[in-house]
Every structure is written in C-alpha cells, then in structure tokens.
UniProtKB/Swiss-Prot annotation:
It comes from the Bacteria. InterPro entries: ACT-like_dom_sf, ACT_dom, UPF0237/GcvR_regulator, UPF0237_ACT. GO terms for biological process: DNA-templated transcription. One of its GO terms (cellular component) is cytosol. This is UPF0237 protein NMB1653. PROSITE patterns: ACT. Residues 5-83 form the ACT domain. Gene3D superfamilies: 3.30.70.260.
C-alpha cells in the first residue's frame, strides 16, 4: 500500500481522535498529517497516513474501518492518496 487518506465524520464527542489513532497504531499505520474541525455538533477529520508497515491487506484495513465505524458511530473511510487528490482537485 502507498500513502492513504482517511476521512472521519461523526457527531462530536470526547475520544474520537483517540479511538481512530488507536486503530491506526495497533495496525502499524503511521500518521503523517492530521487536520480536524468542528462544524456545529459534527466532527470532521482528515488524516494522511503511511501504510507501508501495515501487515494487513488494503481490503482487510477497509473491512476493519467498516467494522469500527459501526462500533464507534462514525463514518471512517480510507482512499489511496492519489485517488483522493484526483477526486478533490478543482
């Protein structure tokens, strides 16, 4: 895997950054850059990560985020950095 962009959206509460960064650390996914913002009661976060040391396949990581999204009541998505940039280019 190359660098990836993770987006997190959900209702604001204590511990969101911890919950997401814990998942990343447990899977040897390194945070390269992180940005977060509150919009009213909604929390948004974009994280650029290095997945080169992660032993799981891309699909396994996507499945993990899908599972954790349900548990944490968050929308957590991961995209390849190049695809993310192409989709958000003006």
């Amino acid at each position: 895997m190359n660098n990836s962009v993770i987006t997190v959206i959900g209702k604001d509460r204590v511990g969101i950054v911890y919950d997401v960064s814990k998942i990343l650390a447990e899977n040897q996914i390194n945070i390269l850059n992180i940005s977060q913002q509150l919009m009213d009661d909604f929390f948004t976060m974009i994280i650029l990560v290095d997945t080169s040391k992660c032993s799981k396949s891309r699909q396994e990581v996507l499945d993990l985020f899908a599972e954790e999204s349900k548990k944490l009541a968050l929308d957590i998505r991961m995209q390849n950095e190049e695809i993310f940039q192409a989709m958000h280019r003006i």
